[in-house]
């Protein structure tokens, strides 16, 4: 539950203090707008998270974390469980060339265009559903703000993935 792009910034990057300030402002704005975690953590947002994790060949720990977050947010097992995650991983291609299986690290993904670019690619391939975010913008509005670094080869197109499916 952080504003889009702020977690793209590496911990030791000089922009991190400004990102922390922006995160704090987002918390205050969310409180003023009465946006609560349960308004944002929904079956749709959890499925979108599973798609993003799969598209980056993310850690199996993400499965455990997303399931725990779902339960804490009151999302029932029939709305989001390990079977939903499995179904998502079977139809989501790996499009981010990230370690440990790939060539690049998270800071390289940030330099390429970050989470927004990843989501823009997944949105264009109709693999995501629009949902609210912590900022009040929708996921698709955030994805539409993506800026791709010319010549990057970290985040690929779903029609030319590293692997046809995650897993």
Identify the residue ranges that each predicted region occupies.
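Catalytic or ion-coupling anion/metal-binding cores of large enzyme and transporter domains
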Residues: 1-167
């Amino acid at each position: 539950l952080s504003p889009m792009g702020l977690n793209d910034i590496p911990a030791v990057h000089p922009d991190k203090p400004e990102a922390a300030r922006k995160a704090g402002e987002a918390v205050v704005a969310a409180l003023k707008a009465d946006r609560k975690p349960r308004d944002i953590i929904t079956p749709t947002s959890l499925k979108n998270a599973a798609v993003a994790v799969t598209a980056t060949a993310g850690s199996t720990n993400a499965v455990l974390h997303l399931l725990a977050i779902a339960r804490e947010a009151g999302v029932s097992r029939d709305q989001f469980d390990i079977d939903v995650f499995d179904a998502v991983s079977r139809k989501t291609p790996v499009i981010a060339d990230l370690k440990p299986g790939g060539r690049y690290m998270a800071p390289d993904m940030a330099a390429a265009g970050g989470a927004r670019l990843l989501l823009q690619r997944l949105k264009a391939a109709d693999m995501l559903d629009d949902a609210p975010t912590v900022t009040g913008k929708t996921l698709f509005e955030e994805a539409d703000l993506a800026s791709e670094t010319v010549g990057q080869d970290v985040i690929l197109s779903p029609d030319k993935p590293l692997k046809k499916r995650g897993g």
